[in-house]
Amino acid sequence: MKDVRLPTLFEIIIVLGVFLALVLSFTVFLDLPIQLALFVSWFIAMLLGIRLGYSYKDLQNAIVHGISNGLEAVLILVSVGALIGTWIAGGVVPTLIYYGLEFIHPSIFLLATLIICSIMSVATGTSWGTVGTAGIAMIAIGEGLGIPLPLVAGAILSGAYFGDKLSPLSDSTVLASSLSKVDVLAHVRAMLYLSIPAYVITAILFTVVGFMYGGKNIDLDKVEFLKSSLQNTFDIHIWMLIPAVLVIVLLAMKKPSMPVIVIGALLGAIWAVVFQGMDIAHAIATAYNGFSIKTDVEFLNGLLNRGGIVGMLDSLVVIIFGLGFGGLLEKLGVLKVIVSTFEKKLTSAGNVTLSTLIVAFLANIFGCAMYVSLILTPKIMEDSYDRLHLDRRVLSRNSEVGGTLTSGMVPWSDNGIYMAGILGVSTFSYLPFMWLSFVAIGLAIIYGYTGKFIWYTKNNTVKAEKLG
């Protein structure tokens, strides 16, 4: 077998620099699909791999392994696409929009959005499902109320990621805890010390900003026109929400996400036939092609013409190519070399915390997927925590914060692509309003350097995870 070596820091800088140059030049200057940039990046990384002594077969297996790490996300993405299509056709999403316009006052809309998405994400454990259902409805309501969509998207994502990093049902919660060798409930308790203060601060911010709007930009005629248009197009009744309630209940019962979402999509198709008068073939087709309608209201068309598996294909390709690139970087040991370069400076809980957050963010940038970040960060950083006798709960918490809360900030990552596509708001537009993410990251750094809620273990084992 041919000897292989780790890359030098210079080689890493070259490869990652070329990656960023490709992504930026393709998307910003050449107006080419980001998928092409990610695909070309495979071969840039493979050239480095061959230089390091790896065979083509080794590198191909690394790509396959990287993609396999995110297959669950791919399956959920396909399922959510089907769900959105049938739920619009079945009147579920239109009913959510209607009642939101009816009962939510503009002054508290942003706070209500944060709370609604938080409750749903904690109950279901999925940020993607939350954004694909409640998120779509809140975006539509926000547009109807005249509230800037990037601000609405920030409230949606703050609520959605709150549950994704805290719910015991969340795959990210389970992944961060298991790879850090921490009991999942011990991990959740450790997260509470960070999540609750961050959530309160975020809620205050959205409340203050919400009252600044206070209905000043609201066009009441537009709201009433939108409500009447929804009633004229769909059968709007409270029982239209039964599929949504059932999905939330099943996910809260810890049933597997993908089958539950598929059941929800099937119910949406049934609702489309029974309550909306759609023929069976057309109702089923909305799961694949998405919902499509032409009304005299252009605004309504923009709200409702979406969903379907087809609508997710571009995102799927980005995720697959991104996961493959992340698999190559993991195989080549890129992040491990970066961390080892600065390891001598990791002499305090604060420095280790900051480094963990940076590694997790870099893994999202170059690994292009939250799963890559959550898998690699604990593996790369665990020795530094053990060397300082830091409890593994601190590792799992920092990995979760850095991996989950920054995943939606990267335009070419799985979360960035999905959130921007579903909400119709670009990543860079909603990024400044992801207040929960910024507050939580800031608190994690403060905790690290002040020693607040930082736990140690004398015997350098993970037994301390059971404390507190």
UniProtKB/Swiss-Prot annotation:
Keywords: Antiport, Cell membrane, Ion transport, Membrane, Sodium, Sodium transport, Transmembrane, Transmembrane helix, Transport
A GO-annotated cellular component: plasma membrane
Keyword match Hydrolase: no
Coiled-coil segments on the chain, per record: none
GO molecular function: sodium:proton antiporter activity
Keyword Transmembrane attributed: yes
Membrane topology: Multi-pass membrane protein
InterPro entries linked: Na/H_antiport_NhaC (IPR004770), Na/H_Antiport_NhaC-like_C (IPR018461), NhaC_Na-H+_Antiporter (IPR052180)
TM ranges: 9-29, 30-50, 73-93, 96-116, 136-156, 192-212, 233-253, 258-278, 309-329, 357-377, 405-425, 428-448
UniProt-annotated location(s): Cell membrane
Functional note: Couples proton uptake and Na(+) efflux to the substrate-product malate/lactate antiport, in an electroneutral malate-2H(+)/Na(+)-lactate exchange. Plays a role in supporting growth to high density on malate at reduced protonmotive force.
Family per record: Belongs to the NhaC Na(+)/H(+) (TC 2.A.35) antiporter family.
Protein name listed in UniProt: Malate-2H(+)/Na(+)-lactate antiporter
Organism of origin: Bacillus subtilis (strain 168)
Gene: mleN
